[in-house]
């Protein structure tokens, strides 16, 4: 507990220091005018400080609980974290350089140690003399797809976490070329993107399990027809002689109603898996934004298959249980069918800068679900406060019913 208390004091000091600097900066900006603020800068950067505390309650009925707490039984845990994300950009007449990273300090009541991690999420160079065309080289996050909580066409990037789809993701080292030829017959705009992504022990080695060496080539064709965006994706894996493809679309049916979808085919040795997504975004007259998505993945387990996995873990057989546990932990998407619903209300009761939201993530196969309630308040510039509550629920041998976390 001593490291956790020390970290608490450190977070408070950081918060007070950051608050003082922000207030002084705001006071000075009220009566200052700098011409340089309106001229293009060679170097620009922005950062923020996030201090978060969490209280967790563990699900002692979960079949995973004995593996996590074999000797010391725990029912609750308190976590503290400090995050400092940084974005930086250098501009020259002929090129640009981008850096995106994050430094994090975390501590937990379950451990006597404080962890420090630094992640370089993006770092790439861009040749700017070819505008509107582009050549980029370095660590890049492509952000393919139109989905919010899921991204089936993320063929050359790390998948989103549907429980926190807005979380920062780490990019991959690659070379990318973008060609924008202009409008073609019947199309308002179009573009062609070519990607080369190498996989070696020291380059993108953690991209996929059991992948030591590979050369992956990617192609993206984009077009705009009226108010509808279309994208076609194609990837070729040289060593595995595998070709994957997919497409997506997004269409504004009206000023407050949008529909989007994705489809991808992923070939794995002798198997072919498909992933699909269909979703909408709708803004009501009373400022409620609805985001609804349905997701299907044939590589996921059926209800019977997942039930068998949980029963095997529960059996406690040293070899079989550990094998099943490893297989479960390696899958971000466990089952085949999910639904995602989020409702966000802007400034209810005329409460300025206050936005509550409610999210429901459900496993349609086993009827278990995860509910996240968030309250966001940003009363002044550069300050934001968030309070959230997460509750997982489900029967025995279901994804969220057997989750180690009960609520947070």
Annotate the PLM regions.
Residues 26-135, 375, 385-388, 408:
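Beta-barrel outer-membrane channel/assembly domains of diderm bacteria
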Residues 51-59, 90-94, 103-107, 141-143, ...:
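Transmembrane beta-strands of outer-membrane beta-barrel pores
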Residues 52-71, 138-150, 162, 168, ...:
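Outer-membrane beta-barrel translocator/channel fold
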Residues 82-90, 122-127, 175-179, 219-223, ...:
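Residues on the lipid-exposed face of transmembrane beta-strands in outer-membrane beta-barrel proteins
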Residues 93-99, 132-135, 184-190, 225-232, ...:
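Repeated loop/turn-to-beta-strand initiation elements of outer-membrane beta-barrel proteins
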């Amino acid at each position: 507990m001593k490291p956790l208390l020390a970290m608490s004091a450190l977070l408070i000091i950081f918060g007070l220091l950051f608050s003082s600097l922000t207030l002084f900066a705001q006071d000075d900006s009220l009566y200052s005018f700098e011409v340089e603020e309106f001229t293009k800068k060679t170097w620009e950067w922005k950062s923020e400080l996030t201090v978060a505390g969490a209280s967790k309650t563990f699900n002692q009925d979960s079949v995973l609980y004995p593996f996590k707490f074999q000797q010391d039984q725990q029912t609750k845990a308190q976590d503290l974290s400090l995050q400092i994300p940084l974005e930086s950009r250098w501009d020259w007449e002929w090129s640009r350089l981008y850096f995106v990273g994050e430094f994090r300090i975390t501590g937990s009541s379950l451990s006597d140690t404080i962890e420090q991690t630094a992640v370089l999420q993006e770092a790439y160079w861009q040749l700017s003399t070819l505008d509107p065309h582009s050549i980029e080289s370095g660590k890049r996050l492509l952000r393919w797809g139109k989905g919010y909580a899921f991204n089936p066409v993320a063929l050359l990037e790390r998948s989103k976490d549907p429980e926190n789809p807005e979380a920062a993701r780490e990019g991959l080292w690659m070379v990318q070329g973008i060609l924008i030829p202009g409008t073609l017959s019947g199309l308002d705009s179009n573009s062609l993107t070519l990607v080369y992504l190498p996989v070696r022990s020291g380059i993108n080695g953690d991209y996929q399990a059991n992948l030591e060496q590979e050369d992956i080539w990617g192609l993206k064709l984009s077009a705009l027809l009226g108010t509808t965006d279309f994208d076609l994706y194609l990837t070729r894996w040289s060593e595995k002689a595998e070709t994957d493809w997919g497409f997506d679309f997004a269409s504004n049916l009206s000023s407050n109603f949008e529909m989007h979808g994705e489809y991808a085919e992923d070939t794995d040795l002798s198997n072919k898996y498909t992933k699909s997504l269909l979703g909408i975004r709708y803004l009501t007259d009373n400022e409620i934004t609805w985001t609804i998505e349905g997701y299907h993945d044939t590589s996921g387990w059926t209800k019977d298959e997942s039930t068998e996995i949980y029963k095997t873990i529960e059996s406690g057989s040293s070899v079989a249980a550990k094998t099943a546990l490893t297989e479960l932990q390696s899958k971000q998407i466990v089952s085949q069918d999910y639904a995602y619903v989020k409702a966000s209300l802007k400034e209810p009761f005329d409460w300025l800068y206050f936005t509550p939201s409610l999210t429901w993530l459900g496993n349609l196969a086993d009827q278990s679900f995860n509910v996240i309630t968030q309250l966001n308040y940003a009363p002044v510039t550069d300050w934001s406060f968030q309070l959230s509550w997460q509750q997982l629920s489900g029967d025995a041998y279901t994804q969220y019913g057997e989750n180690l976390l009960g609520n947070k």
